[in-house]
Amino acid sequence: MKIQMVLAFAAWVINSTTIMAQETIKQTAGRDQLGDFAPKFAELNDDVLFGEVWSRTDKLGLRDRSLVTITSLISQGITDSSLTYHLQTAKQNGITRTEISEIITHIAFYAGWPKAWAAF
């Protein structure tokens, strides 16, 4: 009886587990904007940061990576085009406007009110 229960549970776990496929993300922003001036920086941006780190979705999903990234940028006071890009990416990765607003509000108490205000 116990073996049957264990086998049934194991089958349920296997059937219920979502396996995230690791797909390489293609990014060309670095090369497009900095390729001639700083080719190594562009390569690291496009191939390592986006091509490798962001593509490790089997370790951390894109939605969570977006949450971490926008939180990090706002906490540092970075509200330029980088934040705009990552907020758009966060929406594409399933984060809603309501969640973004709540994230920024939450950050205000840890990173500082002016940084959060600037992010809105």
Language-model features: locations:
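Compact alpha-helical subdomains of small soluble proteins
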Residues: I95-T98
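C-terminal binding/interaction regions
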Residues: I107-A111, A119
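Sec-dependent signal peptide recognition
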Residues: K2-A8
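Short amphipathic alpha-helical surface patches that mediate protein-protein
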Residues: Q88, T105-A108
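Short, structured motif recognition centered on aromatic/hydrophobic residues
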Residues: D64-I74, L83, I100-I104
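Acidic, glycine/proline-rich low-complexity segments that act as flexible tails and inter-domain linkers
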Residues: I19-R65, S75-G77, T84, Q88-Q92, ...
